[in-house]
Amino acid sequence: MRKLIEGLRHFRTSYYPSHRDLFEQFAKGQHPRVLFITCSDSRIDPNLITQSGMGELFVIRNAGNLIPPFGAANGGEGASIEYAIAALNIEHVVVCGHSHCGAMKGLLKLNQLQEDMPLVYDWLQHAQATRRLVLDNYSGYETDDLVEILVAENVLTQIENLKTYPIVRSRLFQGKLQIFGWIYEVESGEVLQISRTSSDDTGIDECPVRLPGSQEKAILGRCVVPLTEEVAVAPPEPEPVIAAVAAPPANYSSRGWLAPEQQQRIYRGNAS
């Protein structure tokens, strides 16, 4: 606590006076550009990894970056989503998972959690679809690899939950909302973007980031590419669906390559 108190003192005596005009503007209202939904994990700082300034992100954080579907017990996520889009007119949403996620590890031992941490057990029910998909379709992988598969699949599951909200469906229909699925790799600092799946009809940009072909990283057969400051972001353009997707390497690695079983249901964009 002493470090926190010292930090508060430094903020009030040093940082605040040199940014007084900014805080006076904040007192008049907020105008964030992006709704950023991510995990409560202490190793993730949305403003740090995106190099965003104060007031640029409207952030929702919880264990596992979960989004209860519309109509589920209200834990605050739904109200925050509705406020961000309806009141603040945010047009971009990022759902960001991360490597080594403790919540995803918990999904693999859910029955044990029911006794040890019943509240966590109840909360993770919002990721049951992710758990069932992975356990039914990814047999034969080691635990560490399954965690990383869960991380990626969970991002897509939560995007589907997000799309159950009336305000989200309405803005998607109007073309006024874009949804992005990201995976932050704690060990490398790299952020990967997942493209929409073949079952999606709208709402998730299909590879708006373009890389030279040699640098493109295919994960789970999706178009998943590193997002770095050197990469130019172009407006999304329609991409042809590629029926055959290059297979991942034979040796599965939890740092980047995910499993081949998902290739049949995933789009992959062309690098240009």
UniProtKB/Swiss-Prot annotation:
Keyword Electron transport: no
Oligomeric form and interacting partners: A hexamer formed by a trimer of dimers. Purified from carboxysomes with the both RuBisCO subunits and the full-length form of CcmM, probably interacts with the N-terminus of CcmM.
Function: Reversible hydration of carbon dioxide. Essential to photosynthetic carbon dioxide fixation, supplies CO(2) to RuBisCO (ribulose bisphosphate carboxylase, rbcL-rbcS) in the carboxysome. Loss of activity results in limitation of CO(2) availability to RuBisCO located in the cytoplasm.
Record has Iron as a keyword: no
Provenance organism: Synechococcus elongatus (strain ATCC 33912 / PCC 7942 / FACHB-805) (Anacystis nidulans R2)
Protein name, UniProt field: Carbonic anhydrase
Keywords from the named record: Bacterial microcompartment, Carbon dioxide fixation, Carboxysome, Lyase, Metal-binding, Photosynthesis, Zinc
Assigned EC number: 4.2.1.1
GO molecular function: carbonate dehydratase activity; zinc ion binding
Gene3D superfamilies xrefs: Carbonic anhydrase (3.40.1050.10)
Practical application: Heterologous expression of 12 carboxysomal genes in E.coli (ccaA, ccmK2, ccmK3, ccmK4, ccmL, ccmM, ccmN, ccmO, ccmP, rbcL, rbcS, rbcX) leads to the formation of bodies that resemble carboxysomes, have densely packed paracrystalline arrays and RuBisCO activity. These structures open the door to generating carboxysomes in plant cells to increase their photosynthesis and productivity, as well as tailoring bacterial microcompartments to specific metabolic needs and molecule delivery. The absence of ccaA, ccmK3, ccmK4, ccmP and rbcX leads to less active RuBisCO.
Gene encoding the protein: ccaA
InterPro entries attached to this UniProt entry: Beta_CA_cladeB, Carbonic_anhydrase, Carbonic_anhydrase_CS, Carbonic_anhydrase_sf
PROSITE patterns: PROK_CO2_ANHYDRASE_1, PROK_CO2_ANHYDRASE_2
Subcellular location(s) of the protein: Carboxysome
GO cellular component, one term: carboxysome
SUPFAM superfamilies on file: beta-carbonic anhydrase, cab
Predominant localisation class: other
